[in-house]
């Protein structure tokens, strides 16, 4: 899991050597678990790695904090058997249109969506969960009980978004969470 995160960080900062990306990612994960905010992490990154710009340090800190939050939540969900979540966006002018398009869509932890492709955007960042791409402030809202499932829902299944009733979703896709 950490190796994947390191490679993603290095991809974010193309000029960054892989060992530096590994150091920064490990530091961010450690500090974030202690409750340190993204802005504080960005300042610490700048202090330790002055070759980075303030904008890059902020981008990396914000992205890694969001990604770490999502990865920890995904791990917790797998532990309790929660296989689905609802994509939630922040509903403001800075939210990507592809992420607004995903807002309210029920997704599986095992099949992350490709929001840009689903919206027909030319950019393609591949499949990812909310919070797991640069500057994303979206978050997953886990579905743990049947009561949390929306009445009429949009569900991401195998690269498409389909509409279905709560009853249909439960019959076809829901397995009781322990």
For the regions a protein language model found, what residue spans apply to each?
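Generic, well-ordered alpha-helical scaffold segments in large soluble proteins
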Residues: 19, 23, 27, 31, ...
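Secondary-structure capping and boundary motifs in well-ordered enzyme cores
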Residues: 16-20, 53, 130
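Short, basic interhelical loop/turn and adjoining N-cap
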Residues: 48-55
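Activation/maturation switch segments at domain boundaries
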Residues: 62-178
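Structured, charged N-terminal subsegments at the starts of enzyme catalytic cores
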Residues: 1-47
């Amino acid at each position: 899991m950490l190796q994947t995160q390191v490679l993603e960080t290095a991809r974010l900062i193309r000029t960054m050597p892989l060992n530096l990306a590994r150091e920064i990612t490990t530091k961010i994960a450690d500090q974030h678990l202690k409750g340190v905010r993204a802005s504080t992490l960005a300042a610490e990154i700048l202090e330790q790695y002055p070759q980075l710009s303030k904008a890059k340090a902020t981008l990396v800190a914000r992205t890694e904090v969001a990604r770490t939050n999502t990865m920890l939540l995904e791990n917790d969900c797998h532990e309790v058997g929660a296989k689905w979540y609802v994509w939630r966006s922040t509903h403001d002018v800075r939210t990507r249109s592809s992420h607004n398009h995903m807002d309210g869509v029920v997704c599986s932890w095992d099949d992350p969506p490709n929001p840009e492709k689903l919206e027909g955007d030319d950019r393609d960042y591949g499949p990812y969960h909310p919070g797991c791409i640069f500057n994303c402030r979206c978050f997953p809202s886990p579905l743990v009980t049947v009561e949390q499932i929306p009445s009429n829902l949009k569900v991401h299944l195998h690269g498409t978004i389909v509409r279905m009733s709560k009853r249909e979703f439960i019959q076809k896709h829901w397995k009781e969470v322990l």
